[in-house]
Amino acid sequence: MASRRLLSSLLRSSSRRSVSKSPISNINPKLSSSSPSSKSRASPYGYLLTRAAEYATSAAAAAPPQPPPAKPEGGKGGGKITDEFTGKGAIGQVCQVIGAVVDVRFDEGLPPILTSLEVLDHSIRLVLEVAQHMGEGMVRTIAMDGTEGLVRGQRVLNTGSPITVPVGRANPWTYHEVIGEPIDERGDIKTSHFLPIHREAPAFVDQATEQQILVTGIKVVDLLAPYQRGGKIGLFGGAGVGKTVLIMELINNVAKAHGGFSVFAGVGERTREGNDLYREMIESGVIKLGDKQADSKCALVYGQMNEPPGARARVGLTGLTVAEHFRDAEGQDVLLFIDNIFRFTQANSEVSALLGRIPSAVGYQPTLATDLGGLQERITTTKKGSITSVQAIYVPADDLTDPAPATTFAHLDATTVLSRQISELGIYPAVDPLDSTSRMLSPHILGEEHYNTARGVQKVLQNYKNLQDIIAILGMDELSEDDKLTVARARKIQRFLSQPFHVAEVFTGAPGKYVELKESITSFQGVLDGKYDDLPEQSFYMVGGIDEVIAKADKIAKESAS
């Protein structure tokens, strides 16, 4: 502005020194509208000076005052603040949108970290979670859904609380997403119970420290790799080995034997797999629709693979919050499935990168152990009930030393390994009895009888595995009598570990079997002692207890005799 005023004064002084007929001797507004044929344009020099003087004088004029920007309705900063600590009710404005990261400015009522914000005047319900305070009233948030259509200046409401989700036996609510919105198009969720997804783990004085077995009714699990009530179990299995069927049978058995409820959290699930699981649960009766929906045994919470990282990073907490309600409010033994726990870590790694944090080893977030610990420590047994978690685990490049699975292993109480080799033999569930482990397999917890039987079964199976190379090369005839007896018992045990499932009745036509733990111990101990050496190994295949083995052997004998 000062330079333009200087130019203006120089031009005026130049005009005073020029001849009286000079075009700039009488500068006035009319000059700007004079025609090109005017006498004042006889000299090109005079024309240029005229334009320069006109620009300088007009630019030097003070700009007219602009009206102040209109404030949002509802008072200073917009919105009526009802809580001074959380800023609940304050209205902010979107300042920047970069993918899943949204920056919001608040004149007052700054929301704390992890507070849920809701975008107003948007086509969908878009929830933002505060992740960082940037200063000067600016917060950086992570979106729980797509940010398409979001624009700068759009209003954002501070809800004053973390993300809350509906809990309880709402009707209908079986199938919903990270923020509690139903996605099965069966109507709105009707409930008055909501809980925040960010909660503290139960206090130590409220936890039940006594170690107890959660009986599943599945022989191979209860005998060789028992689940701890309130423990964490890692489920390893590739595609097509029966992982989904095992999950559904666990849900069914826990509901029938313990009256418990199950929650399935699909973290980074393929949409197709999630839909298949939903349909199969409806067909098997685990999920009931219509008038019988209150009798459903399972709730599904999905943050699918195509969702933004914020949704995938929080859907595990949503499922856990639903499970916590059934544990604490209804005193139930809840079964929580998380598929896949690696996707939870992966999503938090993406969020960390979006927030500009320096990555740790192998590109993971520096808060890897904290993020995973915050989830795992809430999965525990209290004096009211328990949450037993079965978590599918993906191991990147089969590297067990990768930070993500290595950190997860530290929290596990048991591992259930599904083997493709066993499934190829037609033995279901295809649980590997030698690779599956449990911290509960101790005589101090299980008792001497259970422990000795389990170790005896594993010893026979391991000896059989060691003899398989010799059998393949030389044949059974070259084995000693003791080895032949070991092989015969091992093959019977291997088939006796199979079991018909209730949820597979529609496929196999065989009724499902629930086997009590005591019966499993007695039956397998009898096989180890040689009480059933005279029975054919076919009679041990796909049955429940030992009584069914004897009945099946008699039936086979009668058919052979006839």
Swiss-Prot record:
Lineage, top ranks: Eukaryota, Viridiplantae, Streptophyta, Embryophyta, Tracheophyta
Oligomeric form and interacting partners: F-type ATPases have 2 components, CF(1) - the catalytic core - and CF(0) - the membrane proton channel. CF(1) has five subunits: alpha(3), beta(3), gamma(1), delta(1), epsilon(1). CF(0) has three main subunits: a, b and c.
Protein name according to UniProt: ATP synthase subunit beta, mitochondrial
Residues bound to ATP: 237-244
Ranges where the record places region Disordered: 1-43, 58-83
Molecular function as annotated in GO: ATP binding; ATP hydrolysis activity; proton-transporting ATP synthase activity, rotational mechanism
Transit peptide feature range: 1-55
UniProt similarity note: Belongs to the ATPase alpha/beta chains family.
EC numbers, comma separated: 7.1.2.2
InterPro entries attached to this UniProt entry: AAA+_ATPase, ATP-synt_VA_C, ATP_synt_F1_beta_sf, ATP_synth_F1_beta_su, ATP_synth_F1_bsu, ATPase_a/bsu_AS, ATPase_alpha/beta_chains, ATPase_F1/V1/A1_a/bsu_N
Task of the protein: Mitochondrial membrane ATP synthase (F(1)F(0) ATP synthase or Complex V) produces ATP from ADP in the presence of a proton gradient across the membrane which is generated by electron transport complexes of the respiratory chain. F-type ATPases consist of two structural domains, F(1) - containing the extramembraneous catalytic core, and F(0) - containing the membrane proton channel, linked together by a central stalk and a peripheral stalk. During catalysis, ATP synthesis in the catalytic domain of F(1) is coupled via a rotary mechanism of the central stalk subunits to proton translocation.
Keywords: ATP synthesis, ATP-binding, CF(1), Hydrogen ion transport, Ion transport, Membrane, Mitochondrion, Mitochondrion inner membrane, Nucleotide-binding, Transit peptide, Translocase, Transport
Compositional bias annotation for Low complexity: 1-13, 20-40
Designated gene of the protein: ATPB
One record GO biological process: proton motive force-driven mitochondrial ATP synthesis
Entry keyword annotation includes Hydrolase: no
